[in-house]
Structure formats: structure tokens, C-alpha cells
Amino acid sequence: MAPVRISRRDLLRRTAFGVALTGVVPSLVEGTLAAGRSEPRVGADARRLDFPIRLTSNCNAYGPSERVTAAMRAAIRASELDARKESDLLRDQIASEHRVRREELVVAGGSSRLLRMAVSAFLTPGKTLITAAPTFEVISRYATSLNREVVSIPLTPNYAHDLDAMLSCCDSTTGLVYICNPNNPTGTLTPRRDLEAFVAKLPATTHVVIDEAYHHYVDGAADYRSFIDYPIRDQRVIVTRTFSKICGLALHRIGYAVARPDVAGRLEAHRTPEGIDPVASRAAMAALADTEYVRASRMRNADDRQEFFNQANARMARWIDSQTNFVMLDADRPAEQVVAHFESHRILLPKPYARFEKYVRVSLGTPAEMQEFWRVWGLMPGGGHHH
């Protein structure tokens, strides 16, 4: 398929989501305090608080660890916390964790803010962004808001980034390439060896953002290796991570980028005035230290994901193999109808994605939530079974 060039007007017309907002649903889930679990609600749904089950956010369904919630409680009780000092301590801890220098690290209020910083730094007037379709859209939205051209390349039949097609669109005007790996919304991987070959062929003036928001959920894939854990030391590569997903800290919005010092400096030059809340810094430090919770969450997610596949198979429903905590499920009918059906039963699903008109993306919830999901699925005409 040919690449799609998107103008700002086109994107605003096609994107029914609007601007994502964040809310919080505190709950006790299987003995784990989920105070940090938050669900994006968009457009008209932002005003609707009547969805007890919201399978939209791709956050840890079980919330942050007890160690993290204890750190947050202690921070809230503290009489004085210096935001800059706490942010510096977090930066030091992340740098130590990844064995990088402080000057190679940029910490900000969420990975989405880092993506906006990258656009501001590397998409100067006349420069173009190349991205996949579908993929996480924040970076495209911000680029179009600055009247930058966005070239959107459909995924391959295997749902990987079509790196050959992306490369064919790269020239001296390409300022930035965005790769979400694993990809959102498909949950699929683009092999590491292919990405390395792709980066090596990029124009010297083109930078690439590799978004590893779902890195921790990858479960033993032989063709996946993180560009933070196994860096290639290419000065054009920027790797982003977030504490919002497996760590369950979406409410607190902390993300970070790893890049060569000069590139990190260019990102820092476009930092917005908002700082990082000191309570959020304390929470992120506790999450970073709680490696056992991350390990247990990965294992639990793998079990929950396999159970989702099993339930889908029992209903002869097709799905896209995922390496994340969400799954694209073929509803065998217009996705808009499926979303409306679930909303009528007080379950919130994301709006449909272009080129996937019969698929719904389902964030994995708790076992009780997923049991209700499948019950409501069975209430669709035909019992939700494929024909």
C-alpha cells in the first residue's frame, strides 16, 4: 500500500479521539492497592464516569506495587520535598540502572512529553516525520499541530513496521522517524536485526525515536532486544520508556529518554516549564527498585494474555499475536458497533483504528474484568462467534 501523507486538517478530521485526558480509578484488586491505575478517557467519554470496566489504557491492571504505594504515602506525609532534588535523584537512579551517563538521560513528565520535545528539536520547518499506520499517534498529532508533514506507512502483512517502505520515503527533508516497538495498537514486534539495518541506512541528518513503552511485557521473543539494554551507540537514536505501563504510574506521568549527550541536550532545550511532581519522583524510584514486582507482573500478564487467546479461540475469534498487555481482536463486524455494544454494558473500549475497521484493541484487565468482557462479547448478535 502507498504511504499516506497527512495534513493537520486531515488528522483532526480523522482522529475522533481528541486530546487524551487522564483519570484515576482507585480500587483494591486481589489485595493490591491500585491507586495509581488510571484510564485515558477521550472526547465525549471524558465526561462519563459510569464505566466500571475500562479496557483502554494499556496500564498494569493490578496497579502499582505495595512498595510504590508506600513510597507515595510517605512522600505525601513529608512536610517538605524539593521537586528538583527528587527529580535529580530519580535521574541518577535511572542512569545507574541502565549504566548510562546523566548527560545521556532526559527525564520528563511522561514519554508523550518527550515525543513532543523530539518533534520540537528535530522537525524544524520543512522537515518531515515518518511513522507507521497504525501506531501511537501523539507524535503525529504534535507534528501536524506545528504544520509539519507526516508520512504514514502501513504495517507489513505480519504487522511489523515496513522498514523498506519507510526507508524509501526518507530523504534530506526527513527530520524524524518514529518506531513504537512493540507497536501500539497491534502489540507486535519489529525484529532487532531489521531495525539495526534500517538505522544504518538512514540519512545522516535523520533521527529515529524508538518507543519502548511496552518493553517489559515482551516475553522471550528471540528477535527482540532493547536499544537501551543493548545500545548501538548511534548518535541519531533516541530511546524512550515510561513508568505508566507495567509500573502502574500513569497518573504520575514520568518517562525518560536515552540518547547521546548532544542529542539529549537538544531535547532538554525544548523542555516545557512543567516540572515533575516530587511524589511522582518518589513513586518512580520505588518502582525502579521493585524489580520483583516487574518480574511478577510480566509473568502474570503472560498468563492473562494466554487466557485471552484461549477464550478467543473458544469463540473462533481471530486475534493478532501480541507481546504486550493488550490484544487486537477481530470482531468480524464493524468495530464501531462493537464499541457501542460494550458501552451499552458499561465497558469502555478504544475507538476503532484506521485500516483495522473490524478490530478492537482490548487492554488486559483483571480476571474478573475479563470474565465480564467475554460475557458481554457473547451478547452480541451471533453470540460473538465468527462464521
Annotate each language-model stretch with its function:
Residues 1-20:
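N-terminal secretory signal peptides and thylakoid transit peptides that target proteins
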Residues 18, 22-81, 96, 168:
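N-terminal "arm"/small-domain region of PLP-dependent enzymes with the aminotransferase-like
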Residues 79, 89-128, 142, 146:
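Phosphate-binding glycine-rich loop
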Residues 155-157, 302, 311-345:
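Conserved PLP-binding catalytic core of the aspartate aminotransferase-like
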Residues 163-170, 185-208, 212-246:
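Active-site pre-lysine segment of PLP-dependent enzymes
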Residues 236-313, 317-320:
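PLP-dependent aminotransferase class I/II
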Residues 344-345, 349, 353-387:
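PLP-dependent enzyme catalytic core of the Aspartate aminotransferase-like
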